[in-house]
Amino acid sequence: MKLKFELKKKNGNARRGQLIFERGTVQTPAFMPVGTYGTVKGMTPEEVKETGAQILLGNTFHLWLRPGQEVMKMHGDLHDFMNWQGPILTDSGGFQVFSLGDIRKITEEGVHFRNPVNGDKIFMDAEKSMEIQKDLGSDIVMIFDECTPYPATHDEAKKSMEMSLRWAKRSRDHFDKLENPNNLFGIVQGGVYEDLRDVSVKGLTEIGFDGYAVGGLAVGEPKEDMHRVLEHTCPQLPEDKPRYLMGVGKPEDLVEGVRRGIDMFDCVMPTRNARNGHLFVTGGVIKIRNAAHKTDTTPLDPHCDCYTCKNYSKSYLHHLDRCNEILGARLNTIHNLRYYQRLMESIRKAIDEDRFDQFVAEFYARRNREVPPLQKDKA
């Protein structure tokens, strides 16, 4: 089913809306937990839903390699396979393919690479990505693109962006040929170069997509460059389509993305950091394995309503971490996922109440940090 995006309110550049799918409605701005292999690590779908998650991200590349398209089709699709009945967005596999480094070769046709699981030679292109994502039953399909690395010269970024545009057209054409009833998002590339981002936006909007992602950020560039590119690019994207910042990020990155007009985010950070004992709280981050928490009988965050904070102390979580108990990673993950969803709920409420700037000021004050200036404030 084609999604319906309703933009309900703006507060500065911050946007408050909702994505309406057949499988449910997603309030935006929204954060999507990452379920790379068809699971948010250590969590049941019910537990993920209880944290407030409305939509998940799955990984086309990894699910193609394991368990493969045939197994997926035996179950129906990814929703049935993992028992998550809400909406799912899948990335195209491009980022993972390009992360393989020396074991892959990029051509105009697509990417030849060795399967990192068993060493077999395999090939992925725009058409194959569209076919896999149709079999996954993805509610939002991402085009196959090249994620421009950082650093890249202007010429390198230009060639990469132009090839991504050609692949975007191939993705669109094959998506339509397959008669996929769901939704296809374009991905803006161009590195840190504003003129290349302009060309990418123009080309993608001429092809026409159901939503638009900003890709190729959070790949090592300075935060100032990420903010500058976002602030330049977002106003050029269609007002009536959702905007998705891929692979981002820290809580501060989510706030800065919303300040610049982003509606959707995903990142492995809350789950990966949870397994490493880095826990997000109202004032910043707690490193639970530090000895200072051994005798601390208070919860992680008195403001948090998650299962972990309502039932366990820092001392207990420290103990679990020190003993490498699986329960520790699970309780940490529940907390971090809930923190991210509470952050998004607070952002949505602040936009609804026309006090987003006040929210941003308070968010940074709790971290004893200055609010990063917008480009217009620097002028």
UniProtKB/Swiss-Prot annotation:
Residues engaged in binding substrate: 91-95, 145, 189, 216
Active site (UniProt): 91, 266
Enzyme Commission code: 2.4.2.29
Catalytic activities: 7-aminomethyl-7-carbaguanine + guanosine(34) in tRNA = 7-aminomethyl-7-carbaguanosine(34) in tRNA + guanine
Annotated positions binding Zn(2+): 304, 306, 309, 335
Enzyme class: transferase
Pathway: tRNA modification; tRNA-queuosine biosynthesis
Domain of life, source organism: Bacteria
Ranges for region RNA binding: 247-253, 271-275
Any coiled-coil regions, as ranges: none
Cofactor note: Binds 1 zinc ion per subunit.
One Pfam family named in its UniProt record: TGT
Cofactor: Zn(2+)
GO cellular component terms given for this protein: cytoplasm; cytosol
SUPFAM superfamilies attached to this UniProt entry: tRNA-guanine transglycosylase
One GO biological process term: tRNA wobble guanine modification
GO MF annotations in UniProt: metal ion binding; tRNA-guanosine(34) queuine transglycosylase activity
Stated role: Catalyzes the base-exchange of a guanine (G) residue with the queuine precursor 7-aminomethyl-7-deazaguanine (PreQ1) at position 34 (anticodon wobble position) in tRNAs with GU(N) anticodons (tRNA-Asp, -Asn, -His and -Tyr). Catalysis occurs through a double-displacement mechanism. The nucleophile active site attacks the C1' of nucleotide 34 to detach the guanine base from the RNA, forming a covalent enzyme-RNA intermediate. The proton acceptor active site deprotonates the incoming PreQ1, allowing a nucleophilic attack on the C1' of the ribose to form the product.
Family as reported in the entry's similarity comment: Belongs to the queuine tRNA-ribosyltransferase family.
Assembly: Homodimer. Within each dimer, one monomer is responsible for RNA recognition and catalysis, while the other monomer binds to the replacement base PreQ1.
Protein name: Queuine tRNA-ribosyltransferase
Species per Swiss-Prot/TrEMBL record: Vibrio cholerae serotype O1 (strain ATCC 39315 / El Tor Inaba N16961)
